[in-house]
């Protein structure tokens, strides 16, 4: 019965102890308890719900899409987890406190758990923001070191674990008895009473990370400003330097036309550097990566291009190089000193480059559409016997007037910036290379020898002077360069000249080409290439018969059988391109004769059809022999001297106009020979191979030879070799494409880093706005408690609103990512709207970034 009575009492409602008079008429009180309620506070539940959904989207996006699985995004994932826990654990209790008008009816233990959860999750979120800021600082200040660890996910997870461990360690004392309530404390109030611990936790949770975030982000802004300023200055200077190299009347269309004819050194440099045994794959990849990072911020110009432009525009008179050309011991030596530049192609061309030097040669080049732009002096000597004086012929340099050269004479690194050759390898080679080619007649008529020789800096020479006007070339009045011929030589075959024209065996003929430099590396590189790839350097035996050497006498008018003698070239096994040819001949009954011989600076048959080079600018490489006319005095028998000049000419913007003018009509055309494939490497099929014809002593006539005719002839020649060597073409294109891809990847990565930095700035700004008021009030209240001054403490309402402003930081982070980060925005759309096509497109496009 007693149990039944007790049961009946327990079921009685309302309890007898409840005073029904305390129940008011307003609906804002709890029925039967007299606790006032603020139902308007239930609207705050929207904030944790949106925070929950937003951070869930961030977490799913990073875990689902491989493109977002980078180090920085995994840190953002950890931040989203912390904000998610804030929305699940902390915000609902804050809504409850607001609905109950600040009263806590859930007991002291739940109050301690609520405060510990608040401290732990908020501390983790703030520390993760600090780590993300430091990560952005490393990405901006140390990009190479950062790139090596950018995908180190293990390191990121370790940092996240450490941050959560610190946060739990900081919050756990609040649960294990640190929050001791005083005897007179309000039992319905949930607050932290330990002032010392409150100050310490605020310093660790907010103050130190806040100063770190501010310091790091200020440094990031300074670094970005410096980088943008430096890039802007480089672009301005390069634009000015580029403008100085062009004529004032150069129009936009002509600039495009000239740009299409610029020289590209990428293919040659790629092929040559591929043969160097010292360049390993790891070194090449590292150097390409380093250079691409350096160039990514500057899309149009390179820093080193300024040096090239300065050399191109530094002086307008090239006639001051008077001491560059010498002659000694009856050996005509032509020495050329080209301006120094970091261009690899510049050094290769300088190894065999001497410009034409008289007005007739200029007219021929102009008629052919190929102006001479290497200004150099050419000296020719004829050694005298004991009773004869030495006769010396000296030519002056061609002035580098801007009106004479529509395009820059020198090359710049922009033209082959897409080359995969490392920058260090370019600088490792010497600026100039000495090459000497000696052709002489030995005393033994049956002996033929061939050797390769290089110029020595210590070689004794005698200085020759130039007149400086670029047109004077006279011995006893008037001399002219003649017998210009373009005759391509065979590839890596010996060239033997058998000459039997007389009975004299005591006369020798010498011709030399020297390019002033510190060493001679280019011929060695060429030989290395030929040894590494012998099959690419061979030529069909049927092509050997097409080659010939031409002998002519420009001074007198001997019979036709003596004026032009075509002599076959007998091939032998040789891999050198710069050689010495020895032959014996009799010239007793013949007048002074000038020998014409052409050779190429690079005879490697490396690339295939010119049709594969539609994207390459044109490089017209002409091997021109300039015969220096030597006079003989009465009573003196002098040995004639032949001077060779190998010239690299560039098809300029006004080539079409020159071709429409007068062209020299020769009495004999050079035999039709396919050009060496090494020249085809640098030749674009859309631009013609211009034939330099021999000049006859009898007058010249004007003919209308247009560019289209030359183009058709080149295309017809190129079609014959369309099926030859396409492998090297593909390799070169692949290398250039890889370099383009590398630069695009680096540039794209830096753009993404910039967007991430911008997003970080917004996140940091929101973080400061949200959390600074709360922690200022929290520290101020703790100080007031230590000083026992209740008057300085902040009231409940202000403290509550500042706390909710701090919670809004977790609410704002996903919104910031959606607005300022295109990758997250695309991922959010794919998740919300279920766009599978968008997801697949996003994954495929960003998979390897």
From Swiss-Prot:
Segments of this protein annotated with the region Disordered: 450-515
Compositional bias ranges of the Low complexity kind: 457-470
Region (Required for the interaction with gpa-14): 183-849
GO terms, biological process: cellular response to amphetamine; cellular response to nicotine; chemical synaptic transmission; G protein-coupled dopamine receptor signaling pathway; G protein-coupled receptor signaling pathway, coupled to cyclic nucleotide second messenger; negative regulation of dopamine secretion; negative regulation of locomotion involved in locomotory behavior; positive regulation of locomotion involved in locomotory behavior
Biased composition (Basic residues): 477-498
Alphabetical list of SUPFAM superfamilies matching this protein: Family A G protein-coupled receptor-like
Topology with respect to the bilayer: Multi-pass membrane protein
Keywords: Cell membrane, Disulfide bond, G-protein coupled receptor, Glycoprotein, Membrane, Receptor, Transducer, Transmembrane, Transmembrane helix
The protein's assembly and partners: Interacts (via C-terminus) with the G-alpha protein gpa-14; the interaction is direct.
Stored InterPro entries: GPCR_Rhodpsn (IPR000276), GPCR_Rhodpsn_7TM (IPR017452)
Name of the protein in question: Dopamine receptor 2
Coiled-coil blocks: none
Tissue-specificity statement: Expressed in all dopaminergic neurons. Expressed in neurons around the nerve ring and the posterior side of the body including PDE neurons. In hermaphrodites, expressed in the head and tail ganglia including in the RIA interneuron pair, and in a subset of sublateral interneurons and the PDA neuron in the tail. Expressed in cholinergic SIA neurons. Also expressed in the male tail. In males, expressed in the dorsal spicule protractor, ventral spicule protractor, dorsal spicule retractor and ventral spicule retractor muscles and the sensory post-cloacal sensilla B (PCB) neuron.
Cysteine-cysteine disulfides: 111-190
Polar residues: bias regions: 501-515
Transmembrane segments: 40-60, 71-91, 113-133, 156-176, 204-224, 760-780, 799-819
Cellular component terms (Gene Ontology): dendrite; plasma membrane; synapse
Source species of the chain: Caenorhabditis elegans
Topology, Cytoplasmic side: 61-70, 134-155, 225-759, 820-849
Signal peptide annotation: none
